[in-house]
């Protein structure tokens, strides 16, 4: 392993994540804001605790009561006047349903002078859920969508049809109270109705689009689900004000600034990366082949969210697959490294945020008798990168603004 490049990568990751934490953005939005009636806080998503904590520090006892729903292991400590739930992700579980029911009961009976402060971040689609079908049916269709390689927009289009709170329905439940929504975006282009399936946003997707997804992936759905697929979601909401605070664009900008501090010339490739993870890794490696002898320190940056088609039974995530896929292409390059992370600190069903590879990675695996292509076929990037000390482990970061992949070329 190139320890110098790995240290630079770790430092860039640490500083960039700190730059996109939601705390200050939430406080800035709430500063000097006046409220007439009750203030009810609802925070949902992987960054929910962090956002709720910031709101509590800003508003204090002006918050009457609140609920946080976040992923297991993401609640750091109690927050006064706010009940914290941890629940399942990426597949909702009984705690998801229990916590969401508690939210529905809390916002019922509010009047037009009251405000629901709705703090939303990625992961909310699984965490904030009251299904119109059984929990088993919901888990089954979610697993089908994840396994077939459906992207997040397609997954959320289906989820909206099957939920009491998605696709603008939560905002309807809050009426006549006003909903002040602060959103941390984890979807490319920041489409409000797709972030966490848009609980407080008028829905732009249609039943026709949902049916197209069912047919595209040949999903196996029950007769009850088929009936729900024909019920439209709210197309207009008059009680919602929304602010977007944080996105993958800001994450890429933070990475760019940090690369510059280490003397690397940043090259922004895209903040809309959406392809197979293996293809992204191979693409970054191809850039390295072209520029590795330029004599310049270069950093190629790509933000977005890639896709993995699950064909094996291994352990890993899309960012780990990007790093491992790049390893073969940069084999033997002493001045090249690729790292890729999920900004929330979680990549797939693992404890890693992502992965790192450099010119030594492929050789180390070969010496251990491991074929990178077979590993990728089995979706087992985690265990391969563990052998090369290529796992990036940050723990829950408190933010969630997509992923970022970086190719470093030193001089």
Regions found by a protein language model. Give the residues of each.
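A glycine- and small-aliphatic-rich helix-loop capping segment at beta-alpha/alpha-beta transitions
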Residues: 54-63, 81-84, 104, 108, ...
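Glycine/threonine-rich beta-strand-loop-alpha-helix active-site module
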Residues: 68, 72, 79-83, 128-182
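A glycine/threonine-rich phosphate-anchoring loop and its flanking beta-alpha core
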Residues: 153-219
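Accessory alpha-helical/coil subdomains and C-terminal extensions
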Residues: 159, 177-180, 202-283, 287, ...
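An N-terminal, well-structured beta->alpha segment
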Residues: 1-42, 50-51
